[in-house]
Amino acid sequence: TQVGGDILNIEVNLSSGKGMIHATGKLGDVMKESITAALGYIKSNSVEFGVNPKVFDKIDIHLHVPEGAIPKDGPSAGITIFTSLISSLTEIKIKRDVAMTGEITLKGRVLPIGGLKEKLLAAIRYGIKTVIIPKDNEKDLIEIQKDIQNKLTIKKVEFAREVLDIALDGKISKINKKLDWRHIVSESMKQKNQQNQEKSFVN
């Protein structure tokens, strides 16, 4: 629209499990494919992102996009999904004044999106300071008024890993042993033991 697009928040919750991923929030097929691509990229590069590869078989991931009654689709949330997953897996927060848009491939490339002007207007409206966009959209900035661009710090990226240096409030280190999710697995075992004890008691 003339006034701009909208900002989507993405929530990720991790729990002990068997490697399942749940996506909620009335998401369309293309957006679900973005989740699959982002997670596939993370799994194949987990050591680089500071995540123990064994983790993925021991946890379930629930990704939710609020305002569940509103249908959502399209590939432009790809790098946002990727960053949200990395943030949850590494326990490094995302800066609150950063927004991003871009399709992600299985190899971590960031592909161009449509409606750049509308997305920038939405960021301004929500008080966002920094917006990350695909490098391939750089040519589209020529058609966007300078007064819009001057209200934002616009970062152009070619690969998803570049997003992390801009968006995360901390640096990722390779395989942080403290974050190997043993505490989640341990908690899961405690719960199972408790359930077994309760069943034995009932029987």
Show which residues each predicted segment covers.
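Peripheral, non-AAA+ core regions of ATP-driven protein-machinery
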Residues: 3-203
